[in-house]
Each structure stands twice: as structure tokens, then as C-alpha cells.
């Protein structure tokens, strides 16, 4: 009976219900109608954001919209994390969770600021300042049209007040994967 609720050791630690949910997801995701609906929903969000002047990466993807945070907040220097400032602004404004993809995620800490490095060789790659994005991922089977419209309204409000956003300074960062648990303070 335990196998039915907790799964078997060969299930990779997943309960039977979780495996069933994954199987259902795999079944649904290959239906053409569903894919067209999903892609269109993301396109809709992108079109609405563009229509109010919010800069995004084009064309929209199939699962997310990427806001160009450097263009959204040109008054915030890269070293003060404009993407994270937008992420915090969206959360404070409307409870919308997003993720920064840029100098915070790909920076390497104070010893090697704002650059990409290969983890094993330490070879330096392109500067992270090329990427200052905010990802608005759209989970499957969760949001309706009105939810997407809410995101547009909140992002529009924040964009109109973007001059109020301030840069951030890291006050704590772990040695690895700093974007998950770093702590910040707003700059004056």
C-alpha cells in the first residue's frame, strides 16, 4: 500500500501521483491545439507589454517573456542590478514573482565582477552586462486571460514609475548560486 502513495525506490523519489501528473503533462503538451493556445498566450503578453512601451526580447518565446531590464531602467547601472530592481518592483507592486537573468545570476562575485566564467577552467567569457533581463515565465494550466491582463497592468504601472526604482547593493552572497539566496539593500 505504501508504494501507491509514496512510490517505489525505482521511481526516483517521486510518489505515484507525481508520476501520474508528469505523464498527464507529457500527454497534453504534444497536442497541437494546446501548443497553439500556449504560444498565443505568451505572444499576447508580449504584444501588450510592447504596446505600452515596455522593452522585451523579441520574438516572444513559448513559455516566457523576457523584459529588457537595462532598457526598462537605464538610470540603474549594471553593477546595481537593474534586473533585480525590476523583479523587486513587480513583487512589491503586485505580488508578481519573476526572476533576474543578468549580472546577478551570471556575475561571479566581487573577485570577478560582472563577467561569465566557465566553472572548471575559469576562462572568462562575454561580460554579463549584455544580459539584463527579467523572465516572466508562464506556468502551464495555471493562468487565465485575466491573470495575464493583471500582469500587463502591473508591469505598465511599474514602467510608468520606473524612475522611482533604485539600484541594489549585495549585502550577503553565498559562494555559489548567489542569485538564489543573496540579500540586498536599496541604494539611496
What are these regions (language model features)?
Residues 1-83, 88, 104:
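Active-site C-terminal subdomain of aminotransferase-like
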Residues 66, 99, 137:
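Residues in well-ordered beta-strands of folded domains
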Residues 29, 93, 105, 111-188:
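PLP-dependent enzyme catalytic core of the Aspartate aminotransferase-like
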Residues 63, 96, 134:
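A broad, low-specificity signal marking well-ordered, structured residues that form hydrophobic/aromatic
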Residues 44, 48-52, 85-96, 152-161:
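Generic non-transmembrane alpha-helical segments
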Residues 70-98, 112-129:
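Active-site loop ensemble at the mouth of alpha/beta enzyme cores that anchors a bound cofactor
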Amino acid at each position: 500500500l505504501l508504494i501507491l502513495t509514496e512510490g517505489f525506490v525505482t521511481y526516483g523519489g517521486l510518489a505515484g501521483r507525481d508520476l501520474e501528473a508528469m505523464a498527464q503533462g507529457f500527454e497534453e503538451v504534444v497536442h497541437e491545439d494546446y501548443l497553439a493556445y500556449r504560444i498565443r498566450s505568451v505572444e499576447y503578453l508580449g504584444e501588450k507589454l510592447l504596446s505600452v512601451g515596455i522593452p522585451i526580447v523579441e520574438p516572444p518565446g513559448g513559455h516566457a517573456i523576457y523584459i529588457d531590464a537595462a532598457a526598462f531602467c537605464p538610470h540603474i547601472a549594471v553593477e546595481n542590478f537593474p534586473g533585480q530592481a525590476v523583479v523587486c518592483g513587480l513583487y512589491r507592486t503586485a505580488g508578481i514573482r519573476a526572476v533576474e537573468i543578468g549580472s546577478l545570476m551570471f556575475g561571479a562575485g566581487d573577485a570577478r565582477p560582472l563577467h561569465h566564467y566557465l566553472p572548471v577552467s575559469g576562462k572568462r567569457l562575454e561580460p554579463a552586462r549584455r544580459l539584463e533581463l527579467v523572465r516572466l515565465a508562464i506556468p502551464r494550466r495555471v493562468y487565465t486571460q485575466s491573470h495575464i491582463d493583471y500582469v500587463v497592468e502591473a508591469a505598465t504601472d511599474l514602467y510608468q514609475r520606473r524612475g522611482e526604482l533604485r539600484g541594489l547593493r549585495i549585502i550577503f552572497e553565498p559562494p555559489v548560486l548567489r542569485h538564489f539566496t543573496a540579500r540586498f539593500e536599496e541604494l539611496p
